[in-house]
UniProtKB/Swiss-Prot annotation:
Function statement: Probably mediates the hydrolysis of some nucleoside diphosphate derivatives.
Lineage: Bacteria, Pseudomonadati, Pseudomonadota, Gammaproteobacteria, Enterobacterales
Named cofactor requirement(s): Mn(2+); Mg(2+)
Official protein name in the record: Uncharacterized Nudix hydrolase NudL
Family from the record: Belongs to the Nudix hydrolase family. PCD1 subfamily.
Residues that hold Mg(2+) according to the record: E83, E87
UniProt organism field: Shigella flexneri serotype 5b (strain 8401)
Superkingdom, natural source: Bacteria
A biological process from GO: nucleoside diphosphate metabolic process
Sequence motif: Nudix box, positions: 67-89
Keywords carried by this UniProt record: Hydrolase, Magnesium, Manganese, Metal-binding
InterPro entries: CoAse, NUDIX_hydrolase-like_dom_sf, NUDIX_hydrolase_dom, NUDIX_hydrolase_NudL_CS, Nudix_NudL
Length: 192
């Protein structure tokens, strides 16, 4: 697939719905969810945030809107929608959920389910000052180009795991966020 010419219709036709894996949860893993907001345009965008530098965890990092599943959330999808509304004022009713990607285990002990949703292009984003320092849109075709991500193997407590690194304008996209974007690219058939 030529990444420069990806249209929303191309993306939607390539994206195959996956259901969350039911019995994948190891003991002591907390659940979290992120929304992968695809902006509905002829050449779609990918909405990302930069976390506040004042947060205890992942301060200043580029991320998708999301967070822990609360007791009040009916599902991981409901959690992703609630968090997107809290962090960047995306109303849940404005999101057309088209599916989920397989859960990802975070280094902080969460099992994170990426929820893929289409959002209108004219939403007035409003960053929650406590959690988000910036909201920006990256062209989806650029985001899904696998050649932009570079591997880094990290060794911690005798274990090794690979993270992916990339820049978009002044934003450093890496770690779980870059990994989720790569999984989305692979899901729609982008070849490494």
């Amino acid at each position: 697939m030529e990444y420069r010419s990806l249209t929303l219709d191309d993306f939607l036709s390539r994206f195959q719905l996956l259901r969350p894996q039911i019995n994948r949860e190891p003991l002591n893993h907390r659940q979290a969810a992120v929304l992968i907001p695809i902006v509905r345009r002829p050449q779609p965008g990918l909405l990302l945030t930069q976390r506040s530098i004042h947060l205890r965890k992942h301060a200043g990092q580029v991320a998708f809107p999301g967070g822990a599943v609360d007791d009040t959330d009916a599902s991981v999808i409901a959690a992703a929608l609630r968090e997107a509304e809290e962090e960047v004022a995306i109303p849940p009713s404005a999101v057309e959920v088209i599916g989920v990607l397989p859960p990802v285990d975070s280094v902080t002990g969460y099992q994170v389910t990426p929820v893929v949703g289409i959002i209108p292009p004219d939403l007035p984003y409003r960053a929650s000052e406590d959690e988000v320092s910036a909201v920006f849109e990256m062209p989806l075709a650029q985001a899904l180009h696998l050649g932009r991500y570079h591997p880094l193997d990290i060794y911690r407590r005798g274990d090794s795991h690979r993270v992916w690194l990339s820049w978009y304008e002044q934003y450093f996209v890496w770690g779980m966020t870059a990994g989720i974007i790569r999984e989305l690219a692979l899901q729609i058939g982008v070849k490494p």
